């Protein structure tokens, strides 16, 4: 029997309205409703998105009488950091956040010599039930709001700008929607979050669309919707098996949309946007790392605007599976390259702090 999937999040009390939930016109309307002049919306956005400031007491260009009113109405605290855990000499930091309703989510900040990447969560938990993923095994609690997604970025960017992260002051250059949740199952809020992240300051954070990656297990209708947006974000497809028999087991949504359908949607995305699709493939010892599966994957991807990202399986509590042997991994890479396929093995960050791919479970509060 196919594993149970949850596409619609349980109904819960929504988070309070926040500036980042609103587009520029909605912000002006919201400010006007509070009896303030509409241009205060731009000032507020300049502080939040431009200066990464959420404390209205520091917004001295706003009238003192307005600060508290605007702060309470449009800048409520949505996420509170519970703890930070680091590894890689502080260059990788996992943050556990508590939302307004007590829900826990995680994000991971990764500093590299040439870039800084933040992995964000789009849901509390996940409804896709992939058996090798800690998040999927936890089930879906609720969708995150647009502002809860954006606030992970703003809060992390603030710490980075203020030099409280190892390596000194810096800026986030890349955002990957590869944290907790299936991003395309929370499509509307994720899309709005991408717009807030990429719109120029003060409307948004001004991070390039080309620096954004959205992952999916293969929700074909949502991939098609994203294609129609004609954005320049990268699509990452969590494939993990090139054949339906095995993918039905590893990625249960495959019972709904088979490998061929998922890849067809991915190729249409690449052809429409001109952006190379990333095919994510967790290598699991003696499960999906056989030479014939490497050859099958190579034939499926050859000639496409795509790159295969091999991920040594990250351990999760109670998992019966482990990463492929090094020699098997090397042979898998060799066979893919023999088909002319671009392939790399992911430099997995955060494994020691349960912050790597498939390990986020918002535990340890």
From Swiss-Prot:
InterPro entries assigned? Aldolase_TIM, Methyltransferase_A, RlmN_N, RNA_MTrfase_RlmN, rRNA_lsu_MTrfase_RlmN/Cfr, rSAM
- Does Hydrolase show up as a keyword for this record? no
How is the cofactor bound, as the UniProt entry phrases it?
Binds 1 [4Fe-4S] cluster. The cluster is coordinated with 3 cysteines and an exchangeable S-adenosyl-L-methionine.
Origin: domain of life: Bacteria
Annotated catalytic residues: 106, 357
Q: Which reaction does it catalyse?
A: adenosine(2503) in 23S rRNA + 2 reduced [2Fe-2S]-[ferredoxin] + 2 S-adenosyl-L-methionine = 2-methyladenosine(2503) in 23S rRNA + 5'-deoxyadenosine + L-methionine + 2 oxidized [2Fe-2S]-[ferredoxin] + S-adenosyl-L-homocysteine; adenosine(37) in tRNA + 2 reduced [2Fe-2S]-[ferredoxin] + 2 S-adenosyl-L-methionine = 2-methyladenosine(37) in tRNA + 5'-deoxyadenosine + L-methionine + 2 oxidized [2Fe-2S]-[ferredoxin] + S-adenosyl-L-homocysteine
Task: Spell out the disulfide connections.
Answer: 119-357
**Cofactor(s) annotated in UniProt:** [4Fe-4S] cluster
- The residues that hold S-adenosyl-L-methionine are 181-182, 215, 238-240, 314
Function text: Specifically methylates position 2 of adenine 2503 in 23S rRNA and position 2 of adenine 37 in tRNAs.
State the similarity comment.
Belongs to the radical SAM superfamily. RlmN family.
Q: What else is known?
A: Reaction proceeds by a ping-pong mechanism involving intermediate methylation of a conserved cysteine residue.
- Recorded protein name is Probable dual-specificity RNA methyltransferase RlmN
Its lineage opens with: Bacteria, Bacillati, Actinomycetota, Actinomycetes, Streptosporangiales
């Amino acid at each position: 029997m196919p594993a149970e999937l949850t596409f619609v999040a349980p109904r819960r009390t929504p988070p309070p309205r926040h500036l980042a939930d609103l587009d520029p016109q909605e912000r002006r309307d919201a400010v006007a409703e509070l009896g303030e002049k509409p241009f205060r919306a731009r000032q507020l956005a300049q502080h939040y998105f431009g200066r990464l400031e959420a404390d209205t007491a520091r917004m001295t260009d706003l009238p003192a009488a307005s600060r508290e009113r605007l702060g309470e109405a449009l800048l409520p605290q949505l996420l509170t950091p519970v703890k930070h855990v680091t590894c890689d000499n502080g260059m990788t930091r996992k943050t556990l956040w508590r939302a307004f309703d007590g829900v826990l989510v995680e994000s991971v900040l990764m500093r590299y010599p040439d870039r800084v990447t933040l992995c964000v969560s789009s849901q509390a938990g996940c409804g896709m039930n992939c058996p090798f993923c800690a998040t999927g095994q936890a089930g879906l609690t609720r969708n995150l709001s647009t502002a809860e997604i954006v606030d992970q970025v703003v809060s992390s960017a603030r710490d980075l700008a203020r030099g409280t992260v190892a390596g000194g002051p810096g800026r986030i250059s890349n955002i990957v929607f590869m944290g907790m949740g299936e991003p395309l199952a929370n499509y509307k809020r994720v899309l709005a979050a991408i717009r807030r992240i990429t719109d120029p300051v003060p409307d948004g954070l001004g991070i390039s669309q080309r620096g954004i990656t959205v992952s999916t297990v293969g929700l074909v209708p949502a991939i098609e919707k994203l294609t129609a947006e004609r954005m320049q974000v990268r699509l990452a497809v969590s494939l993990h098996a090139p054949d339906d028999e095995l993918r039905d087991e590893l990625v249960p949504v495959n019972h709904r949309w088979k490998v061929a359908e998922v890849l067809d949607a991915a190729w249409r995305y690449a052809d429409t946007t001109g952006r190379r699709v990333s095919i994510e493939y967790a290598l699991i010892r003696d499960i999906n790392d056989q030479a014939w599966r490497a050859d099958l994957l190579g034939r499926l991807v050859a000639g496409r605007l795509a790159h295969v990202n091999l991920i040594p399986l990250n351990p999760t509590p109670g998992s019966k599976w482990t990463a492929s042997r090094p020699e098997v991994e090397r042979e898998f890479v060799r066979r893919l390259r023999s088909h002319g396929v671009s392939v790399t093995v992911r430099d997995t960050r955060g494994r020691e702090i349960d912050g790597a791919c498939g390990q986020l479970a918002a535990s340890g509060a």
